[in-house]
Amino acid sequence: MKQQVEVKELKEGKYVIIDDEACVIKSITKSKPGKHGAAKARVEAIGLFDGQKRSYIGSVANKIYVPIVERKTAQVISITGDITQLMDMGDFSTFEIVVPDEYKDKIKEGEEVSYITALGKIKLDIRT
């Protein structure tokens, strides 16, 4: 799910969709309006799910999509290799995700973990 906002309403640390990917805004720079033009904004962001750096350049009055990012908790049901089966603690639905190598030793069966969901993608949100 996503919604539209004007570029001038964006803030650092919030989310934005650039190249059909949910991103976290790292910096926003705005230029002054010229004699015949509108102010421009440059948004630097990092992909929430892939970690790639992306940028957007456009008028401050332009509208841009912002993803609706949800943080939820789930219980680890089973771990098979690098695939983990989780059950959402809110609606009790089950789903499987691939766990990155750096998180494999931090999750155990029966524990609760938090995860992020946006634009139909899911990512573990394990904070150390």
UniProtKB/Swiss-Prot annotation:
Location in the cell: Cytoplasm
Highest taxon above the source species: Archaea
Gene Ontology cellular component terms for the protein in this record: cytoplasm
Organism, as annotated: Methanosarcina barkeri (strain Fusaro / DSM 804)
HAMAP family: eIF_5A
Gene Ontology BP terms: positive regulation of translational elongation; positive regulation of translational termination
Modified residues (Hypusine): 35
Name of the protein this chain belongs to: Translation initiation factor 5A
General function of this protein: Functions by promoting the formation of the first peptide bond.
InterPro entries: IF5A-like, IF5A-like_N, NA-bd_OB-fold, Rib_uL2_dom2, Trans_elong_IF5A_hypusine_site, Transl_elong_IF5A_arc, Transl_elong_IF5A_C, Translation_prot_SH3-like_sf
A GO MF label: translation elongation factor activity
Disulfide bonds: none
Keywords: Cytoplasm, Hypusine, Initiation factor, Protein biosynthesis
Keyword Lyase: no
The family this protein is said to belong to: Belongs to the eIF-5A family.
